[in-house]
Amino acid sequence: MIKSELFERITEKKTYIPAKIIEYVVKNILEYMSLSLEKGNRIEIRGFGSFSLHYRFARIGRNPKTGEKVYLKEKYVPHFKPGKQLRDRINNIYKKI
């Protein structure tokens, strides 16, 4: 699902809320989450999961196209850890398949 599909689905379910308001709220939630991660904060949404930053050490990688060695700098990457309720919900659906 992409952001525009999220707007559409919420708008379909909450017909009494103008689409512009829904778009504004979703964009602001995502922006505040991004700003919080930029500051190094952890974000926890109970029942859904948590977002944090993971440190990646500098290393020697490989260009898959050419095979040549490439130096990769150290960096922080966003990480999502699903909460127990989300994991259980997904596992219950796919257990049936």
Curated annotation (Swiss-Prot):
Q: Does the keyword Lipid metabolism apply?
A: no
List cellular component terms (GO): chromosome; cytosol
Among the GO molecular function terms of this UniProt record, one is:
DNA binding
According to its UniProt entry, the protein's GO biological process terms are:
DNA recombination; regulation of DNA-templated transcription; regulation of translation
Q: Does the keyword Transcription apply?
A: yes
Source species, domain of life: Bacteria
Pfam families, per the entry = Bac_DNA_binding (PF00216)
Sorted UniProt keywords: DNA recombination, DNA-binding, Transcription, Transcription regulation, Translation regulation
The record's PANTHER family line, in alphabetical order, gives: DNA-BINDING PROTEIN HU, INTEGRATION HOST FACTOR SUBUNIT BETA
User: Which family would the database say this protein is a member of?
Assistant: Belongs to the bacterial histone-like protein family.
Q: What does this protein do?
A: This protein is one of the two subunits of integration host factor, a specific DNA-binding protein that functions in genetic recombination as well as in transcriptional and translational control.
Describe the subunit structure. Answer: Heterodimer of an alpha and a beta chain.
- From the Swiss-Prot or TrEMBL record, give the protein name: Integration host factor subunit beta
Species assigned in the record? Buchnera aphidicola subsp. Cinara cedri (strain Cc)
Show the taxonomic lineage: Bacteria, Pseudomonadati, Pseudomonadota, Gammaproteobacteria, Enterobacterales
